[in-house]
């Protein structure tokens, strides 16, 4: 062959290639691509990032190791490693650490360290900690090494030590010394960082030796503080920023680990018994002291106590504090301190009552007591409460007259202040403490004064010297000096610098603005000229309108001339028939729509006057009036001269009034909107005020308020707030409506005020001061609900509206002083160590600004410095929130006020441009844009922009350059040269960057700023550039500057171009013409640079979303935001269990709108919520088109679409409901066609409200549509899901809804059976409640009737139903049955014969049977579907249990047997799968245990049905056997098996027994053999050894049953033999046990079906299939002697088939002799006495199974006589038998033999017993049966007892044993009865004696411990000797007997017995040589007994009887 093909193709193909060399080639190229990548993100990284998990899992070690190289390059270049780290770090730990490659471990650790450096430490630490718990020593050792290296490199800030300390104990207990040493190295590294704090954390878990060894290593460590060897990327960027500012890096502060957090809480209350509390109340102090000692001991030994109710203990301790015995009091104080240490925060609520009593104990003289009190108080204040919590108690105690108390309290306060970790708690009570100290300083006791000075000094260390000055000035100078002297000596753990009072600045005061400083009115859009314009919005110089026509004739003539009307139309307007009027109006509408804009100008007034005359606005027909309104709408939209006075006033009042008309509401609303667009909305509002203010119809007022609210949303608040003068009438009108008594009016007014509040903010409250207090409280609650809402974007405009570019018109609200709300606590919390506290403080500040309506005074106190510190916060959320607050402040304060703060904050903001997290950079850009858009403009940034450009960070440079290019044009004034010249340094630095993109951006910025920055500034910076880079930069400078230093003027002829884009020279000239506002030259390039700053998700959404086209355009655009996982994510985060409400609230609408915007484009979402009919119809058309064209997209948003449909069902408009229901109908039909199944979550979004609305619908057409939709849902939803939602609605307040729901439930039950109902105990009472309601009673009866038809009288058990109702329920059921069964007897004539009547009856029964079969199938399918949708939730478990109950009830009816067979496989599959899923949790949840029991019971009940079991196929049995044996193995393998698992093990055993007993034997053997063939390849088997053992036991048990005639009849021997051959073929190398089991099965088949086996074998040979059945033939040849081959070769009856080398002749057919024994076989054909040993389980051992030992016994076969012969049991004593027997265990054989020897078959005398004696006797009998050595003897006792007392009930005694053992007892009783009742034959004694001889032989050979070979040799020798002497005589005798007839068959048996006796006697002599002389028959081998010598036989038998008695007694001993 030639050389291997060189790798080629794409990287993807090579990496996925099967050849590892190709994969390595692909990995090398991928590494190169990563290293050459300039970008840190993009398609390359997004494509390959997720694939490293698969690449690293390569099975080839070489390829796997080489995969680390591209991973290393990927991590080095990628900016978003944290997005992919979690996917590959686990593979690194699991696969690469276990690699066999020498350097794989080191490279893997390098990759993990690189990942941590890329700010992705969390997944790495998690994976490594998981690796430390691995069972593989290699992975464990490498994980520990990686943790050590990571901690050493990055420190505990990135590698949390706390997580390591939670699981370190097993490392030091590992047997591998390397692991223990590596763990020691890890802890040495931890000690480097946290020092001695580590020792108490590990002292309890380590042995003293290990701890001592570690401490020795700790002492050797250097004392220098540990520092990380590397920074992460984010830390490096901050360090670089600090370095550029000259800020020194601070040493890393290691988080202090509290050992308390690692401890396990213990509940101590159970230890405090009632004796403890009684002892505390004892009179003797010794008893009280003893109990307190006990409490102290418990608390001392419990460092962490579980939180519980300690109120009783605290009450007892409080009483003890008042005890007279000081020592007991001291112990109580100590106990309280220990409780505080152990409970900490959990003890806070109990502390207060103890404070004063404990403080009073400071008066005690004993030092130990004082020390205990101090310790306890320190514990209370440090662990449970703060000093500020007990300041009142301290103040009261300081009023004590005992000096010692004051002195000690001051010492305690000083210690608390000095040791505090929360200075803020001290600052809260500064005033109270200073008051205490100043009083104590004046005390007469010097010790009190000294302690007060120290405490005062400690307080000064907290609040600072400046804050102390006011207090010190009030004190005597000498005392003040003493305090100052003590202050430096006091430790100040935390220093808080008080904020100095800022000097008063005029800029901080709001002054009235003089008129000279105001901007021109034209600029604001609020000039007086605008307020004096005409209402039409036209300017004063516009041409006046022509005068209107004066008469109606002129109007008609004018309109006829314009072609709008004709005489026919005018005549039609006045006709009495509404259809004629409607036709005329529709003609006018068509003509108006056809007019152009120029044609309709000036015609609107005439049209309106014509229609107002005829048919007039009082038209009674709504269709005519609707068309008139449509004409008015066209006039409003198309006539530019439309005015209010001449046009709108004619119809406005009528239009407002028609808002209440359901049929005209939509068109009236649309007309008002169109009118507002033509004449300002404010004019429409004014008309509403005037018309509705005093109107008597409250509905008109309410609907008008609703329309105003919609108008504000669609036009914006500007439509009514051009000044406070226009807003005030609206507010006055709304407040007037608030006083209305009508709830609808009041509710609408509140909603309108909420809308205004959303738009204008908190200032609205200023206008509501005169509102009544109760109403105001309601408003406040509503305002609280909408506080986070933002005003919607206006989508309508009116004529005269300010252009979009102009400044929005706003109401000037007063600025709010928020300095009062910015409390010191909030400012302090901004610096808290806990990020959540900081985040909460920032959120509170943001809330304060929002509540102030973003109009605040520039009085911020210490907020700005605190915000500056938060810009460098480690938490991303805090940083983003800080940036948002800064942007809000710039807008809320105004540009001039915020300027000084901006210059302080901007440097920190710009540094964040280099943050590696995209959200942070986006927030920075957004904040900067907001600042620029304020009055400050770009100017405030100029002096700070150079800093981010100088940094060596690609992010910082790119973002700062791109932003500067875009915003440099927003400068408000000419830049200051000193500031803008600083950009020269930044531009020069960026021109040297390695990134071409950054250099291009810098070039672009230089082209803009070349006119602002002189060349000399660039020359200065060029000197610091490397000489190699200077020429390229100089070339760029030469492009924009002349040699004289002046900038080159922009070219006017040519176009300047760049590598990416170009712009025209004319544009450049125009842009550069104004130096104060320079424009960028490369606009396209700027746009490209802006794109990376936008969030990537937004870009993708913009690409996916397409703007909806107008009504006149195409409508087939995509409007669904397709997300394949969106529905799943919404289901997980769903917070509303059931989408059901009586009326949609604001919260519901808000939730729905947010969800719709997530799934649909914004334009389409607006259409979905539009109230205009045109928009709604357009939306409906688009939706229906999408449903037809792209159902997949619709299904992805099906839940939200269902919710929107239900929301729209609440519309009052009939047309709107029809549109929505049409969408629903089409949607459901499409889902049915697609065979889609609606899940429970999707159904919850639709079904509840649909059911509710189906009852409330009044329109018949709508009601029918609802019913049709529910029928469609019955096809789409699972019946139990639909039923569950229906049962929830059955309690509805609307009786119509209840009726519809009950009908739906009846339909579901009728179609699917009662199993869909779930828990009948809950369902039936809910249904029966409606029996008391007259409206819903009929439906309730129908539902109960359907239920009764399935479960009969069971439905009456769960509720009290009256007898009358029961009759109705049952009667309805009977009527239904009678209606279904048509009786045709009335059609028969009297002369019809009886035979014809019977035929007719048979014909009538046929359809009934088929119907019954269909019903049963439906019921079974219903139960099956319920089980298939099982999931492990409590509710579903109950449904499943109920379904199983229903199924068991169905199976109890024997009619289902034949039908169930068709579903058996599916049922078994579902039942076993549920059982397998739930079994692992059975010990954790009682509900799951209950479910498992029902499942097992169901399976057993199925298999107990013999009709079903016999028809189960191989697949059914395989399903049940596989799962049952798996679970049985799992239960048995649990070493700590509990009662539950033991009980389930028995249940699994019952399943196996039912299969073995009831299933078809052929199918059973086929299944078992096939399963044994597949066992080795099944990876799902957890315990294969146990699994195989159980399979073999099942096969053995099935083999035993082959002696049963019924099983033999159904057995197909050919099939079983074929399966045996297949099994042997697929498993050529079997273990000994399996092979022996296979032999046993084959031998049993041969013994019981010899003819069929022989025939099958002959057929194989005749067909030439020996090769195919080679394995079976080999087994038969092995089992059967060599003569078997002669038989199957066709030798016939004349052949001799012998074994063991004996030569025997048979003249009467073929005879078989084995081992020297010759038996006559006249009853079987050919061959039947070849004895083959089989290993079978003893039934006694099955019951007494203590060691699961399988006992091998020798079974003798029975032979059947030809005509008059009887069954005989033949002995088997061949060498083969002996060999097989000796291979079994001695213990099992001995037990079986002893139990056989102890059987007493003699009759018992149990007559004359009393009842009590009978009971006792029966107990003793069953005890004997329970003894495995006396079982059979006990069964004989039981037989004679039953024969004596046949009427006595022994069932209770039988039930005490297992079902298996009961069956065993029953079988043996039957055998005993049969044997007793059978006639006694002459050969019984011989046969029985023969059996006894066999038992004795086998027993004693085993007892004498002879080797197997010796036993076999002895047997063979003895048998050969005896048989050689006796064969001739026996053969001759046999020949004679064969000719004499069947009555002389005893002779051969006597001969055989004599031979056996001789053999036995010889063996006994061998075993007992000392007794040979005493035996009368010691030479029996010389004189063998003959059949003709009865004397010799008798003497031999007598001798053996005597010997038998001796040996029996010996064996018993």
Swiss-Prot record:
It is found in: Cytoplasm, Cytoskeleton, Microtubule organizing center, Centrosome; Cytoplasm, Cytoskeleton; Chromosome, Centromere, Kinetochore. It comes from the Eukaryota. Residues 524-543, 1053-1106, 1372-1406, 1695-1735, 1746-1796, 1913-1939, 1967-1995 have a biased composition (Low complexity). GO terms for cellular component: cell cortex; centrosome; endocytic vesicle; kinetochore; microtubule; spindle pole. Residues 512-557, 1043-1109, 1372-1413, 1695-1809, 1905-1949, 1966-1995 are annotated as: Disordered. PANTHER family: MICROTUBULE ASSOCIATED PROTEIN XMAP215. Belongs to the TOG/XMAP215 family. This is Centrosomal protein 224.
């Amino acid at each position: 062959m030639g050389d291997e093909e060189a790798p080629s193709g794409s990287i993807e193909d090579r990496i996925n290639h099967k050849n590892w060399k190709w994969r390595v080639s692909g990995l090398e190229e991928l590494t190169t691509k990563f290293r050459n990548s300039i970008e840190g993100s993009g398609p390359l990284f997004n494509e390959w990032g997720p694939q490293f998990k698969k690449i690293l899992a390569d099975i080839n070690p070489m390829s796997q190791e080489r995969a680390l190289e591209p991973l290393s390059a990927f991590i080095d270049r990628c900016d978003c490693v944290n997005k992919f780290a979690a996917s590959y770090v686990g593979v690194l730990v699991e696969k690469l650490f276990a690699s066999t490659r020498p350097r794989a471990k080191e490279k893997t650790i390098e990759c993990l360290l690189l990942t941590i450096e890329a700010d992705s430490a969390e997944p790495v630490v998690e994976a490594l900690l998981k690796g430390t718990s691995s069972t593989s020593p290699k992975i464990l050792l490498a994980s520990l090494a990686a943790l050590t290296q990571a901690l050493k490199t990055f420190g505990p800030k990135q590698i949390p030590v706390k997580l390591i300390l939670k699981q370190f104990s097993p490392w030091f207990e590992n047997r591998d010394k390397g692991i223990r040493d590596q763990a020691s190295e890890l802890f040495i590294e931890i000690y480097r960082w946290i020092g001695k704090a580590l020792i108490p954390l590990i002292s309890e878990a380590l042995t003293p030796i290990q701890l001592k060894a570690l401490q020795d290593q700790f002492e050797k460590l250097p004392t220098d503080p540990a520092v990380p060897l590397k920074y992460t990327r984010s830390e490096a960027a901050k360090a670089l920023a600090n370095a550029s500012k000259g800020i020194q890096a601070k040493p890393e502060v290691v988080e202090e680990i509290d050992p308390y957090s690692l401890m396990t809480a213990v509940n101590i209350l159970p230890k405090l018994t009632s004796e403890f509390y009684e002892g505390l109340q004892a009179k003797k102090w010794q008893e009280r002291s003893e109990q307190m000692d006990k409490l102290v001991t418990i608390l001392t030994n419990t460092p962490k106590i579980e939180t519980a109710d300690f109120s009783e203990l605290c009450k007892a301790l409080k009483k003890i504090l008042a005890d007279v015995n000081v020592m007991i009091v001291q112990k109580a104080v100590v106990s309280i301190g220990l409780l505080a240490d152990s409970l900490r925060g959990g003890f806070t609520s109990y502390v207060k009552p103890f404070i004063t009593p404990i403080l009073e104990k400071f008066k005690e003289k004993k030092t130990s007591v004082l020390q205990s009190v101090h310790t306890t108080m320190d514990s209370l204040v440090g662990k449970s409460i703060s000093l500020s919590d007990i300041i009142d108690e301290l103040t009261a105690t300081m009023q004590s007259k005992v000096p010692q108390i004051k002195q000690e309290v001051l010492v305690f306060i000083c210690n608390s202040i000095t040791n505090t970790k929360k200075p803020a708690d001290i600052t809260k009570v500064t005033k109270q403490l200073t008051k205490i100290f100043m009083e104590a300083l004046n005390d007469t006791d010097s010790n009190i004064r000294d302690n007060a000075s120290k405490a005062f000094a400690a307080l000064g260390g907290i609040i600072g010297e400046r804050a102390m000055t006011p207090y010190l000035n009030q004190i005597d100078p000498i005392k003040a000096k003493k305090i100052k002297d003590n202050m430096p000596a006091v430790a100040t753990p935390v220093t808080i610098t008080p904020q100095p009072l800022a000097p008063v600045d005029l800029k901080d005061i709001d002054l009235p603005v003089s008129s000279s400083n105001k901007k021109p009115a034209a600029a604001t859009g609020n000039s007086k000229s605008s307020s004096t314009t005409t209402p039409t919005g036209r300017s004063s110089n516009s041409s006046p309108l022509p005068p209107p026509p004066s008469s109606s004739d002129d109007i008609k003539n004018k309109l006829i001339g314009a072609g709008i009307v004709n005489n026919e139309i005018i005549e039609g307007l006045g006709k009495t028939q509404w259809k004629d009027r409607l036709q005329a109006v529709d003609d006018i509408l068509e003509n108006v729509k056809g007019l152009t804009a120029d044609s309709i100008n000036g015609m609107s007034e005439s049209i309106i006057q014509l229609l107002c005359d005829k048919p007039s606005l009082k038209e009674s027909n709504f269709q005519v009036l609707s068309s008139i309104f449509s004409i008015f709408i066209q006039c409003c939209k198309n006539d530019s001269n439309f005015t209010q006075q001449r046009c709108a006033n004619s119809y406005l009042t009528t239009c407002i009034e028609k808002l209440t008309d359901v049929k005209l509401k939509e068109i009236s609303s649309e007309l008002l909107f169109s009118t507002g667009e033509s004449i300002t909305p404010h004019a429409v509002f004014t008309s509403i005020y005037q018309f509705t203010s005093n109107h008597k119809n409250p509905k008109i007022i309410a609907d008008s308020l609703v329309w105003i609210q919609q108008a504000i949303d669609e036009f914006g608040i500007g439509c009514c707030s051009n000044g406070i003068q226009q807003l005030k009438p609206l507010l006055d009108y709304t407040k007037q409506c608030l006083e209305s008594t009508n709830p609808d009016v009041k509710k609408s007014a509140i909603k309108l005020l909420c809308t205004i509040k959303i738009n204008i903010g908190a200032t609205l409250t200023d206008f509501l001061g005169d509102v009544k207090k109760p109403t105001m409280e309601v408003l406040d609650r509503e305002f609280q609900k909408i506080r986070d809402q933002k005003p919607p974007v206006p989508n309508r405009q009116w004529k005269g509206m300010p252009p979009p570019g102009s400044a929005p018109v706003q109401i000037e609200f007063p600025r709010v002083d928020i300095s009062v709300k910015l409390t010191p606590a909030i400012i302090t919390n901004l610096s808290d160590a806990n990020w959540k506290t900081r985040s909460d403080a920032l959120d509170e500040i943001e809330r304060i600004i929002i509540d102030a309506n973003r109009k605040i005074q520039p009085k911020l106190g210490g907020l700005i410095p605190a915000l500056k510190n938060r810009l460098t916060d480690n938490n991303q959320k805090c940083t983003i929130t800080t940036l948002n607050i800064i942007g809000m402040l710039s807008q809320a304060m105004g540009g001039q006020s915020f300027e000084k703060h901006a210059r302080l904050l901007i440097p920190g903001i710009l540094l964040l441009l280099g943050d590696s997290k995209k959200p942070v950079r986006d927030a920075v850009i957004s904040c900067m844009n907001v600042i620029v858009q304020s009055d400050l403009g770009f100017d405030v940034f100029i002096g700070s922009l150079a800093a981010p450009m100088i940094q060596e960070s690609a992010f910082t440079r790119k973002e700062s350059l791109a932003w500067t290019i875009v915003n440099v044009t927003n400068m408000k004034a000419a830049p200051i040269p000193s500031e803008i010249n600083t950009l020269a340094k930044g531009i020069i630095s960026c021109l040297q960057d390695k990134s071409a993109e950054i250099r291009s951006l810098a070039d672009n910025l230089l082209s803009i700023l070349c006119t602002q920055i002189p060349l000399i500034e660039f020359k200065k910076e060029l000197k610091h550039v490397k000489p190699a880079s200077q020429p390229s930069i100089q070339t760029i400078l030469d492009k924009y500057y002349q040699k004289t230093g002046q900038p080159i003027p922009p070219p006017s002829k040519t176009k300047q171009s760049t590598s990416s884009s170009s712009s025209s020279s004319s544009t450049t000239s125009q842009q550069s013409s104004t130096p104060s506002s320079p424009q960028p030259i490369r606009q396209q390039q700027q746009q490209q640079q802006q794109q990376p700053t936008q969030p990537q998700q937004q870009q993708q959404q913009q690409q996916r979303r397409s703007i909806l086209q107008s009504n006149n355009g195409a409508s087939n655009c995509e409007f669904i935001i397709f997300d394949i996982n969106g529905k799943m994510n919404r289901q997980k985060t769903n917070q509303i269990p059931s989408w059901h409400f009586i009326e949609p609230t604001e919260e519901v609408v808000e939730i729905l709108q947010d969800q719709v915007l997530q799934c649909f484009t914004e334009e389409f979402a607006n259409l979905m919520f539009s109230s205009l009919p045109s928009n709604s119809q357009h939306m409906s058309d688009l939706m229906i088109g999408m449903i037809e064209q792209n159902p997949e997209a619709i299904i992805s948003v099906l839940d939200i679409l269902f919710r929107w449909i239900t929301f729209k069902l609440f519309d009052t408009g009939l047309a709107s409901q029809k549109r929505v229901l049409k969408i629903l109908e089409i949607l459901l039909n499409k889902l049915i066609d697609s065979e889609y199944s609606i899940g429970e979550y999707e159904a919850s979004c639709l079904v509840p409200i649909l059911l509710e609305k189906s009852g409330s619908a009044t329109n018949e057409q709508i009601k029918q549509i609802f019913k049709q939709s529910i029928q469609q849902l019955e096809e789409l939803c699972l019946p139990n899901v639909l039923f569950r939602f229906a049962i929830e609605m059955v309690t509805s307040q609307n009786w119509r809804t209840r009726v519809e729901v009950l009908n739906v439930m009846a339909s579901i039950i009728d179609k699917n059976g009662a199993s869909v109902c779930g828990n009948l105990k809950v369902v039936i009472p809910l249904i029966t409640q409606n029996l008391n309601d007259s409206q819903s009673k009929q439906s309730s009866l129908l539902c109960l009737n359907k239920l009764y038809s399935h479960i009969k009288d069971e439905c009456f058990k769960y509720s009290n139903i009256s007898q009358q109702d029961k009759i109705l329920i049952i009667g309805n059921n009977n009527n239904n049955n009678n209606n279904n069964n048509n009786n045709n007897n009335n059609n028969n004539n009297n002369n019809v014969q009886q035979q014809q009547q019977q035929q007719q009856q048979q014909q009538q029964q046929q359809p009934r049977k088929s119907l019954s079969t269909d019903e049963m199938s439906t019921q079974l399918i219903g139960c099956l579907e319920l089980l298939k949708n099982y999931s492990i939730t409590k509710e579903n478990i109950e449904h499943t249990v109920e379904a199983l109950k229903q199924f068991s009830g169905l199976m109890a009816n024997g009619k289902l047997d034949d039908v169930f067979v068709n579903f058996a496989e599916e049922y078994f599959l579902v039942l076993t799968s549920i059982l397998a899923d739930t079994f692992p949790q059975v010990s954790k949840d009682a509900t799951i245990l209950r479910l498992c029991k029902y499942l097992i019971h169901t399976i057993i009940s199925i298999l107990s049905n013999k009709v079903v079991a016999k028809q189960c196929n191989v697949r059914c049995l395989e399903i049940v056997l596989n799962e049952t044996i798996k679970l049985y193995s799992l239960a048995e393998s649990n070493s700590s098996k509990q009662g539950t698992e033991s009980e389930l093990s028995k249940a699994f055993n019952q399943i196996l027994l039912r299969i073995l007993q009831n299933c078809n034997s052929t199918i059973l053997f086929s299944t078992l053999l096939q399963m044994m063939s597949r066992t080795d390849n099944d990876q799902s088997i957890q315990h294969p050894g146990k699994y195989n053992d159980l399979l073999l036991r099942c096969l053995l048990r099935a083999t035993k049953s082959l002696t049963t005639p019924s099983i033999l009849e159904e057995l197909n021997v050919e099939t079983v033999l074929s399966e045996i051959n297949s099994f042997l073929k697929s498993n050529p190398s079997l273990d000994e046990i399996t092979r022996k089991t296979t032999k046993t099965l084959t031998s049993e088949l041969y013994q019981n079906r010899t003819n069929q086996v022989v025939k099958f074998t002959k057929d194989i040979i005749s067909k030439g299939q020996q090769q195919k059945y080679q394995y079976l033939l080999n087994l038969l040849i092995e089992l059967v002697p060599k003569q078997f081959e002669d038989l199957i070769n066709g030798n016939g009856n004349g052949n001799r088939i012998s074994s063991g080398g004996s030569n025997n002749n048979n003249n009467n057919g073929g005879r078989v002799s084995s081992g020297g024994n010759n038996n006559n076989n006249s009853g079987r054909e050919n061959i039947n006495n070849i004895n083959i040993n089989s290993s079978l389980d003893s039934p006694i051992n099955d019951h007494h199974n203590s060691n699961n030992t399988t006992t091998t016994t020798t079974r003798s076969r029975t032979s059947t006589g030809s005509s008059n012969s009887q069954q005989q049991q033949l002995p088997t004593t061949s060498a083969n038998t002996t060999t097989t027997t000796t291979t079994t265990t001695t213990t099992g054989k001995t037990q079986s033999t002893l139990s056989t020897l102890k059987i007493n078959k003699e009759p018992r005398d149990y007559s004359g017993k009393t009842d009590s004696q009978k009971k006792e006797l029966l107990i003793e009998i069953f005890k004997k049966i329970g003894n495995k050595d006396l079982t059979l003897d006990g069964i004989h006792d039981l037989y004679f007892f039953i024969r004596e007392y046949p009427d006595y009930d022994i069932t209770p005694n039988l039930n005490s044993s297992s079902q298996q053992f009961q069956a065993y007892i029953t079988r043996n009783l039957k055998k005993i009865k049969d044997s007793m009742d059978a006639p006694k034959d002459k050969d019984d004694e011989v046969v029985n004696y023969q059996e006894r001889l066999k038992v004795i032989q086998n027993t004693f050979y085993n007892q004498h411990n002879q080797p197997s070979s010796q036993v076999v040799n002895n047997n063979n020798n003895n048998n050969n000797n005896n048989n050689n002497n006796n064969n001739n005589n026996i053969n001759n005798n046999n020949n004679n007997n064969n000719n004499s007839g069947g009555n002389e068959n005893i002779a051969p048996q006597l001969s055989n017995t004599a031979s056996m006796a001789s053999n036995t006697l010889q063996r006994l002599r061998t075993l007992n040589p000392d007794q040979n002389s005493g035996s009368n028959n010691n030479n029996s081998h010389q004189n063998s007994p003959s059949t003709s010598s009865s004397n010799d036989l008798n003497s031999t038998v007598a001798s053996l009887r005597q010997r038998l008695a001796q040996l029996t007694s010996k064996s018993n001993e």
